[in-house]
């Protein structure tokens, strides 16, 4: 079964045409699964952690192992080492050490989360297809005018084919709410971070094949 999505044919800065394009309901009409999306997005964010945090415990701190003073008779609190965590420049009580936070993401779960997110974007009218987004010059103002024909929202993710136009990259570099990704770079986190997602019409078939 096929779904109909709007595809914008942007001819110039003022006018554009809109046609309906058939897409697979197995990708863009997938049931919404918030629990699966949460699990995959959490795993993606955890996998971004470096895990390089390191602190020194009392065994790692440099210093003498000699007892500072005798146990009794001085009137001061007993102490066994200058490297004690309660001393200044001493070690940390439960020192953090480098470790891996990697979580495995199954392919079937990843595809299900991607299809669920794309379908939710379609249902919320936040995903559109565009035929092309050619810029004559690398001007941010030109890009904003063309995007304004499609949506008034400034938070936009543009997904292109593997060859990204250089002018498009330069024009969007001044806009922190507009990002240009190719088909191989998108992931569940990037899809949910933007209010509007624009897909090039040429990548729809490849995207459906990848997620089928």
From Swiss-Prot:
<comment type="subunit">
    <text>Part of the 50S ribosomal subunit.</text>
</comment>
<dbReference type="GO" id="GO:1990904">
    <property type="term" value="C:ribonucleoprotein complex"/>
</dbReference>
<dbReference type="GO" id="GO:0005840">
    <property type="term" value="C:ribosome"/>
</dbReference>
<keyword id="KW-0689">Ribosomal protein</keyword>
<comment type="function">
    <text>Forms part of the polypeptide exit tunnel.</text>
</comment>
<feature type="compositionally biased region" description="Polar residues">
    <location>
        <begin position="54"/>
        <end position="65"/>
    </location>
</feature>
<comment type="similarity">
    <text>Belongs to the universal ribosomal protein uL4 family.</text>
</comment>
<keyword id="KW-0699">rRNA-binding</keyword>
<dbReference type="GO" id="GO:0019843">
    <property type="term" value="F:rRNA binding"/>
</dbReference>
<comment type="function">
    <text>One of the primary rRNA binding proteins, this protein initially binds near the 5'-end of the 23S rRNA. It is important during the early stages of 50S assembly. It makes multiple contacts with different domains of the 23S rRNA in the assembled 50S subunit and ribosome.</text>
</comment>
<keyword id="KW-0694">RNA-binding</keyword>
<dbReference type="InterPro" id="IPR002136">
    <property type="entry name" value="Ribosomal_uL4"/>
</dbReference>
<dbReference type="InterPro" id="IPR023574">
    <property type="entry name" value="Ribosomal_uL4_dom_sf"/>
</dbReference>
<protein>
    <recommendedName>
        <fullName>Large ribosomal subunit protein uL4</fullName>
    </recommendedName>
</protein>
<dbReference type="GO" id="GO:0003735">
    <property type="term" value="F:structural constituent of ribosome"/>
</dbReference>
<dbReference type="InterPro" id="IPR013005">
    <property type="entry name" value="Ribosomal_uL4-like"/>
</dbReference>
<keyword id="KW-0687">Ribonucleoprotein</keyword>
<dbReference type="GO" id="GO:0006412">
    <property type="term" value="P:translation"/>
</dbReference>
<dbReference type="Pfam" id="PF00573">
    <property type="entry name" value="Ribosomal_L4"/>
</dbReference>
<feature type="region of interest" description="Disordered">
    <location>
        <begin position="54"/>
        <end position="85"/>
    </location>
</feature>
